[in-house]
Amino acid sequence: MSILYEERLDGALPDVDRTSVLMALREHVPGLEILHTDEEIIPYECDGLSAYRTRPLLVVLPKQMEQVTAILAVCHRLRVPVVTRGAGTGLSGGALPLEKGVLLVMARFKEILDINPVGRRARVQPGVRNLAISQAVAPHNLYYAPDPSSQIACSIGGNVAENAGGVHCLKYGLTVHNLLKIEVQTLDGEALTLGSDALDSPGFDLLALFTGSEGMLGVTTEVTVKLLPKPPVARVLLASFDSVEKAGLAVGDIIANGIIPGGLEMMDNLSIRAAEDFIHAGYPVDAEAILLCELDGVESDVQEDCERVNDILLKAGATDVRLAQDEAERVRFWAGRKNAFPAVGRISPDYYCMDGTIPRRALPGVLEGIARLSQQYDLRVANVFHAGDGNMHPLILFDANEPGEFARAEELGGKILELCVEVGGSISGEHGIGREKINQMCAQFNSDEITTFHAVKAAFDPDGLLNPGKNIPTLHRCAEFGAMHVHHGHLPFPELERF
């Protein structure tokens, strides 16, 4: 089944004319930069999930918020779909353009508007890079906690859209847990403030509803984030294991003992070797799996927790446990993990990154299941996990130049996500649904739940013009997805019209 927008399954889009939209934008949005030739728009035909590509009708790059309002007004009046894009680092096709839609690029809004060290908050524009926030507040001994692997490039607006996490989300939470409020523009011109400067606000929690909505409800125009004081001490333990199953069990043992690490990450042998060859982090390349466990806080507590975790790891079957001897080694240990994705990209022509979550207790069994599926589909899988909260990132290695190999990788990825659902988990932890997992949403949710999701979208976007075909499948798509499952991946009587 095609993962790109298919009107038969995802709903008909308005039939728009490029020239008329271009003329309307030029007339009503003075000074707006508009890209419309093939040479100009090719760089925007995908996000970080480069396997799926579509050239948009137009690309617009506003530099003033008034222009954003005017762009949305024009698109609303002409019934033109709008896809919002931040830095384009997303891994689920959430910012994949539409052939009949305008791509609204928010990358030029990169000003840090205000830093309040006493109130421990910062007010920023949506194009500000994640890491730039921590760099800006570092002189105040503060930082912004969510740290996705792409934090050097990804934008805070995109983080809000996907509810991004990172290696330290086990203790410090996802994006939604680190926001105070956001300013939002709806397609029909309404400006909304969701959340407040206080720790809580009355009424429904629309801030939580909007965070992770993948650009389907409105456009984020400003973000107020919470800041945290830097922990006085942070130490990292690196534990080696002779099996991934033992490493998986050790994760549960640490949490069961009442210890909440700042980060608890797991890598298997394939990802270990790739990262070590790329970063030279000091990883044991003969280990079947490693755990990275960071403990932070005051010196006395960290020292005690390090000793406890060391004992837990050894009892769980660790063949070796190393404590980073200084800050430089701690940074190297984390650099290997944070560069695992590009490292794997060096050992395979292509890779397909999954993002499922499972209960910690299910980790050993799911790892065994992934190994079986890897053999069944004859594709290598490098496993990288936010192990502490059960967020898995299996990287499926393939060669797009080999006919049929990407389709096989897609199918394998879908089976892994469905395995996550079977054990009580979810098809996404932090990358979002986008186009990539639109079919697997049908395995995660029933028709009543999906109908409710559509009702929520309609409350914010009654015309369905904001990022259509992402995140929430139509019931038509789910019916066809179910038919394919019943018939082992093939539609019965494919020559017949479906709906």
Curated annotation (Swiss-Prot):
Residues 52-230 form the FAD-binding PCMH-type domain. Disulfide bonds: none annotated. Keywords: Cell inner membrane, Cell membrane, FAD, Flavoprotein, Membrane, Oxidoreductase. Its EC number is 1.1.99.14. It is found in: Cell inner membrane. Gene3D superfamilies: 3.30.465.10, 3.30.70.2190, 3.30.70.2740, Uridine Diphospho-n-acetylenolpyruvylglucosamine Reductase, domain 2, Vanillyl-alcohol Oxidase, Chain A, domain 4. Its cofactor is FAD. Coiled coil: none annotated. It catalyses: glycolate + A = glyoxylate + AH2; (R)-lactate + A = pyruvate + AH2. GO terms for biological process: DNA damage response; glycolate catabolic process. Disruption phenotype: Abolishes glycolate oxidase activity. Is unable to grow on glycolate as the sole source of carbon, in contrast to wild type. Optimum pH is 8.0-8.8. One of its GO terms (cellular component) is glycolate oxidase complex. In vitro the glycolate oxidase activity is inhibited by the sulfhydryl inhibitors CuSO4 and PCMB, by KCN, but not by the metal complexing agent EDTA. GO terms for molecular function: (S)-2-hydroxy-acid oxidase activity; D-2-hydroxy-acid dehydrogenase activity; FAD binding; glycolate dehydrogenase activity. The keyword Zinc-finger does not apply. InterPro entries: FAD-bd_oxidored_4_C, FAD-bd_PCMH, FAD-bd_PCMH-like_sf, FAD-bd_PCMH_sub1, FAD-bd_PCMH_sub2, FAD-linked_Oxase-like_C, FAD-linked_OxidoTrans_Type4, GlcD. Induction: Induced in the presence of glycolate or glyoxylate. Part of the glcDEFGB operon, which is induced by growth on glycolate, under the positive control of GlcC. Also induced by growth on acetate. Expression of the glc operon is strongly dependent on the integration host factor (IHF) and is repressed by the global respiratory regulator ArcA-P. It holds the Pfam family FAD-oxidase_C. The glycolate oxidase likely consists of three subunits, GlcD, GlcE and GlcF. PANTHER family: GLYCOLATE OXIDASE SUBUNIT GLCD (PTHR42934:SF1). Component of a complex that catalyzes the oxidation of glycolate to glyoxylate. Is required for E.coli to grow on glycolate as a sole source of carbon. Is also able to oxidize D-lactate ((R)-lactate) with a similar rate. Does not link directly to O(2), and 2,6-dichloroindophenol (DCIP) and phenazine methosulfate (PMS) can act as artificial electron acceptors in vitro, but the physiological molecule that functions as a primary electron acceptor during glycolate oxidation is unknown. Belongs to the FAD-binding oxidoreductase/transferase type 4 family. This is Glycolate oxidase subunit GlcD. It comes from Escherichia coli (strain K12). The gene is glcD.
